[in-house]
Amino acid sequence: MASSTVPVSAAGSANETPEIPDNVGDWLRGVYRFATDRNDFRRNLILNLGLFAAGVWLARNLSDIDLMAPQPGV
């Protein structure tokens, strides 16, 4: 992939447009900054709602598994 020459600043400003990452490292760095930005209420709300929804989904889908039941073929 061709890398772009757009500079990436460590601290984003409020009126900065989101960038499109050109590789996995930039994408992971963006996810990390998204998850650890303590000053952005909207991002924190989205992140918390997403984590809550993932927890609800896991609880609903894993509730039918009986870990104490005898396993087939053992």
From Swiss-Prot:
Spans through the membrane: none
Positions carrying N-acetylalanine: 2
GO BP annotation list: protein insertion into mitochondrial outer membrane
Pfam families xrefs: TOM6p
Compartment(s) of residence: Mitochondrion outer membrane
InterPro entries membership: TOMM6
Keywords noted in UniProt: Acetylation, Membrane, Mitochondrion, Mitochondrion outer membrane, Protein transport, Transport
Cellular component GO terms held in the UniProt record: mitochondrial outer membrane; mitochondrion; TOM complex
Complex and partners: Forms part of the preprotein translocase complex of the outer mitochondrial membrane (TOM complex) which consists of at least 7 different proteins (TOMM5, TOMM6, TOMM7, TOMM20, TOMM22, TOMM40 and TOMM70).
Name the record gives this protein: Mitochondrial import receptor subunit TOM6 homolog
Encoding gene (name): TOMM6
